[in-house]
């Protein structure tokens, strides 16, 4: 060991001495004595490794308390951090999909703070059913006879098939064998549910007679799957639920539908593309309809199944139902969200998903122009900051070909180097409240459709 190495080792402080320093008192109060000591030991090991490798001390050895504070502060951050979503995708799966209404947030907080009547009937002091209150709401909204709630729509489809078609065949059009994110495929779900898939028709055209010819003594269901995350256009043919229900009645085979996104209101009244609604399919005679709670409905992650009472009863009594049931927080948020639909005149104001989807391009353009000046003053030395028209998307597999006119702030490096865009995007991801945009066509785009808190946005970007 050289004299220089010995000298560097001698500069490393003893843990006891560091802990006696006044700057460590607050750290010990905040993070606990055990964790602070554990980290100091780790840092001493790191420092010794640096000395052995490069014959120098780490820069942070000049202020141990500051480095400990920085590391423990970062460590204490939640893995689920709030972000500002300016990607242009409203229901961004990776960012948690639907924002919850204030009523839903309050309902969840109340359900977490105290015991609730989850499975308790106040009328006779007996055991109740956890889905009952929501089932009544869903029946009122959709016109269904009964309803069942599980933890997501994939679970809803699995339960629906396992409880009504295990060991039997399910007839589905070839053009509706969808795959959603995470390689969730309808054929795979059928296998897990113990069903046999019977494909009919072709990718682009399926006729009523295709279903008729497929039905046999082992057929349990005729199934429709709404292709909410892709669109087949051109020379196409598909039969709707009403026609399939008529065929099912003739052949004595129930019809079920996986709607996926599942809007409970006619979106066209807000200037958005229309999506099929559960209540329309119930009115057409479909026996079971499944859809998501956290997409166009604007609530928490949940799988909702509405339909005929005798079919729902089979789902409720199946062993999978207990494994897939929703917890009290989900049920509280979903109930509060569904109650908003009882007052449709205020829905676009109180439901964040609908509020963001219905923001006009003109309003967003004015907002972008208002924010452009301070950002150009701050970033103008390196980037040209401009207001540009753009197209937002709904996201989460909803209305895949439809786009919403919007406006964005774009950042273009004066030297044209793409690495500067990557660096800027990385800097924004490290902010206390990360700002998430997207890089496209030599620019960093911040689509402002989902920006409601301008003050927080500017506080982050002008740091």
Curated annotation (Swiss-Prot):
<keyword id="KW-0808">Transferase</keyword>
<protein>
    <recommendedName>
        <fullName>L-seryl-tRNA(Sec) selenium transferase</fullName>
        <ecNumber>2.9.1.1</ecNumber>
    </recommendedName>
</protein>
<dbReference type="InterPro" id="IPR004534">
    <property type="entry name" value="SelA_trans"/>
</dbReference>
<keyword id="KW-0648">Protein biosynthesis</keyword>
<dbReference type="InterPro" id="IPR015421">
    <property type="entry name" value="PyrdxlP-dep_Trfase_major"/>
</dbReference>
<comment type="pathway">
    <text>Aminoacyl-tRNA biosynthesis; selenocysteinyl-tRNA(Sec) biosynthesis; selenocysteinyl-tRNA(Sec) from L-seryl-tRNA(Sec) (bacterial route): step 1/1.</text>
</comment>
<dbReference type="GO" id="GO:0001514">
    <property type="term" value="P:selenocysteine incorporation"/>
</dbReference>
<comment type="similarity">
    <text>Belongs to the SelA family.</text>
</comment>
<keyword id="KW-0963">Cytoplasm</keyword>
<dbReference type="GO" id="GO:0004125">
    <property type="term" value="F:L-seryl-tRNA(Sec) selenium transferase activity"/>
</dbReference>
<dbReference type="Pfam" id="PF03841">
    <property type="entry name" value="SelA"/>
</dbReference>
<keyword id="KW-0711">Selenium</keyword>
<dbReference type="GO" id="GO:0005737">
    <property type="term" value="C:cytoplasm"/>
</dbReference>
<feature type="modified residue" description="N6-(pyridoxal phosphate)lysine">
    <location>
        <position position="295"/>
    </location>
</feature>
<dbReference type="InterPro" id="IPR025862">
    <property type="entry name" value="SelA_trans_N_dom"/>
</dbReference>
<comment type="subunit">
    <text>Homodecamer; pentamer of dimers. Binds only one seryl-tRNA(Sec) per dimer.</text>
</comment>
<keyword id="KW-0663">Pyridoxal phosphate</keyword>
<comment type="function">
    <text>Converts seryl-tRNA(Sec) to selenocysteinyl-tRNA(Sec) required for selenoprotein biosynthesis.</text>
</comment>
<dbReference type="InterPro" id="IPR015424">
    <property type="entry name" value="PyrdxlP-dep_Trfase"/>
</dbReference>
<dbReference type="InterPro" id="IPR018319">
    <property type="entry name" value="SelA-like"/>
</dbReference>
<dbReference type="GO" id="GO:0001717">
    <property type="term" value="P:conversion of seryl-tRNAsec to selenocys-tRNAsec"/>
</dbReference>
<dbReference type="Pfam" id="PF12390">
    <property type="entry name" value="Se-cys_synth_N"/>
</dbReference>
């Amino acid at each position: 060991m050289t004299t220089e190495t010995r000298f560097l080792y001698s500069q490393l402080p003893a843990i006891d001495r560091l802990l006696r320093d006044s700057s460590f008192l607050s750290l010990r109060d905040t993070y606990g004595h055990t964790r602070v000591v554990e980290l100091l030991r780790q840092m001493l090991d790191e420092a010794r490794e640096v000395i052995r490798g490069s014959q120098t001390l780490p820069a942070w050895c000049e202020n141990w308390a500051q480095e400990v504070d920085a590391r423990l502060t970062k460590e204490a951050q939640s893995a689920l951090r709030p972000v500002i979503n300016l990607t242009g995708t409203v229901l961004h799966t990776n960012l948690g999909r639907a924002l919850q209404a204030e009523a839903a947030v309050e309902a969840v907080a109340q359900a977490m703070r105290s015991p609730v009547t989850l499975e308790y009937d106040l009328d006779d002091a007996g055991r109740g059913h956890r889905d009952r209150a929501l089932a009544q709401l869903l029946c009122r909204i959709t016109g269904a006879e009964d309803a069942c709630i599980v933890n997501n729509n994939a679970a809803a489809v699995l339960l629906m098939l396992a409880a009504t078609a295990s060991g039997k065949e399910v007839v589905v059009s070839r053009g509706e064998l969808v795959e959603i994110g995470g390689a969730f495929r309808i054929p795979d779900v059928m296998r897990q549910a113990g069903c046999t898939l019977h494909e009919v028709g072709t990718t682009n055209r399926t006729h009523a007679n295709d279903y008729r010819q497929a039905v046999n003594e082992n057929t349990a269901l005729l199934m429709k799957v709404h292709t909410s995350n892709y669109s087949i256009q051109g020379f196409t043919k598909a039969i709707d639920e009403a026609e399939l229900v008529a065929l099912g009645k003739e052949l004595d085979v129930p019809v079920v539908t996986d709607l996926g996104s599942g809007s409970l209101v006619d979106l066209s009244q807000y200037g958005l593309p229309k999506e099929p609604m559960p209540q329309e399919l119930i009115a057409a005679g479909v026996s079971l309809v499944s859809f998501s709670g956290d997409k166009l409905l604007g609530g928490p992650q949940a799988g909702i199944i509405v339909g005929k009472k005798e079919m729902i009863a089979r789902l409720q009594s199946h062993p999978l139902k207990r494994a897939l049931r929703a917890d009290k927080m989900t049920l509280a948020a979903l109930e509060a969200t569904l109650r908003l639909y009882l007052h449709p005149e205020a829905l676009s104001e109180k439901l964040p998903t609908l509020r963001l989807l219905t923001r006009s391009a003109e309003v967003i353009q004015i907002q972008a122009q208002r924010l452009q000046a301070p950002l150009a003053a701050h970033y103008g030395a390196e980037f040209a900051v401009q207001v540009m028209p753009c197209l937002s998307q709904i996201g989460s597999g909803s209305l895949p070909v439809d786009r919403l006119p919007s406006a964005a702030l774009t950042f273009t490096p004066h030297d044209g180097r793409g690495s500067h865009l990557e660096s800027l995007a990385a800097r924004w991801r490290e902010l206390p409240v990360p700002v998430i945009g997207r890089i496209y066509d030599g620019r960093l785009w911040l689509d402002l459709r989902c920006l409601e808190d301008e003050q927080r946005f500017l506080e982050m970007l002008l740091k």
